[in-house]
């Protein structure tokens, strides 16, 4: 498989960005963004889609973690 051309990469990234923006605007409701998801899948290699999905999950986790949305499972009071 040949590497995607610059135009193909830009189309992929653009489709990804539109899909992610839709998810952000619709409280992660994937059903409302199905058309953009289909466009994203049609524009990007399958391996990239897997990577971008994992990347988004990580970025959302990191954002919540940094905002203090997670508590430590171990108590530090006894240390």
Curated annotation (Swiss-Prot):
Any one cellular-component term (Gene Ontology): mitochondrial intermembrane space
Keyword annotations from UniProtKB, A to Z: Disulfide bond, Mitochondrion
Pfam families for this protein: COX6B
Location(s) in or outside the cell: Mitochondrion; Mitochondrion intermembrane space
Entry's Gene Ontology BP terms: mitochondrial cytochrome c oxidase assembly; respiratory chain complex IV assembly
Domain CHCH as annotated: residue spans: 9-52
Motif interval(s): Cx9C motif: 12-22
Disulfide-bonded cysteines: 12-44, 22-33
Superkingdom of origin: Eukaryota
The keyword Mitochondrion is assigned to this record: yes
Sequence motif: Cx10C motif, positions: 33-44
GO molecular function: copper ion binding
The protein's role, per its UniProt record: Involved in the maturation of the mitochondrial respiratory chain complex IV subunit MT-CO2/COX2. Thereby, may regulate early steps of complex IV assembly. Mitochondrial respiratory chain complex IV or cytochrome c oxidase is the component of the respiratory chain that catalyzes the transfer of electrons from intermembrane space cytochrome c to molecular oxygen in the matrix and as a consequence contributes to the proton gradient involved in mitochondrial ATP synthesis. May also be required for efficient formation of respiratory supercomplexes comprised of complexes III and IV.
Family classification: Belongs to the cytochrome c oxidase subunit 6B family.
Assembly and interaction partners: Found in a complex with TMEM177, COX20, MT-CO2/COX2, COX18, SCO1 and SCO2. Interacts with COA1, MT-CO2/COX2, SCO1, SCO2 and COX20. Interacts with COX20 in a MT-CO2/COX2- and COX18-dependent manner. Interacts with COX16.
Name of the protein in its database record: Cytochrome c oxidase assembly factor 6 homolog
Originating species: Mus musculus
Organism classification: Eukaryota, Metazoa, Chordata, Craniata, Vertebrata
């Amino acid at each position: 498989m040949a590497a995607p051309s610059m135009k193909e990469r830009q189309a992929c990234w653009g489709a990804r960005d539109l899909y992610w923006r839709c998810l952000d605007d619709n409280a992660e409701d994937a059903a409302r963004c199905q058309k953009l998801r289909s466009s994203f899948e049609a524009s990007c290699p399958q391996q990239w889609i897997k990577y971008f999905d994992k990347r988004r999950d990580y970025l959302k986790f990191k954002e919540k973690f940094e905002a203090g949305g997670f508590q430590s499972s171990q108590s530090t009071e006894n240390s």
